[in-house]
Amino acid sequence: MATTKSTTPRRKAAQSAQERPAAQGAQFPLECPKPRQMHPSEAVVIVREISKDAVKLFVMPKPSAVRSILNETFGPLGWAERRYFADSRLWCAVGVFNPYMRDYCFKDAAALEGKHPGSPERWKEETSFVAAAELWGVGSDVMALPSIVLRADQVPIAGIQKPGRKPNDPPQVVGYKLASAPTVDKFLRNPDTGEIISVQFVDKEGRKATWEK
């Protein structure tokens, strides 16, 4: 008696794990675009302490310049920021978009402490943002600078006076200030590492002063 041949297709043998093509996965550590170095005009000079003999300066990136570099490096939609209070301090988190996570990866930093000019609230807002962006490499070359001390023979320091208690009393010196506020004129960098090893300052009168690491 004739037998009927089955028309049911045979299943293809399952591929082993070694035979299957490997899925394209993320390679760790993930590569991240490297921000460029900061220009001298993108830094701001802040007076921390001053006496008749010297002035202590703090050089930091301008927040507007940090935003520009973030846009250049990651794109306007490639980064984000958020703020919150913790431990009685204002914190800022700067996030960079991660295509594998399809979300932003955030790094957090608190506002810088110490003496500062102007509004305390603005100082906290700006320095927490700059410090968080530094964790992504933006402005890290400038933020790596230590406090810079310039002598009175390098920058003009003027006394702040107030009248004496009596009409015939000589004026009293109650503090000191820079006769002209300096700005950053030039950076000198290590050719191998890019580290800033010297800063040249200039004031409105064109007087220049140089600090070397």
What are these regions (language model features)?
Residues 64-213:
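Positively charged, aromatic-enriched nucleic acid-contacting surfaces
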Residues 2-56:
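N-terminal, Lys/Arg- and Ser/Thr-rich interaction peptides
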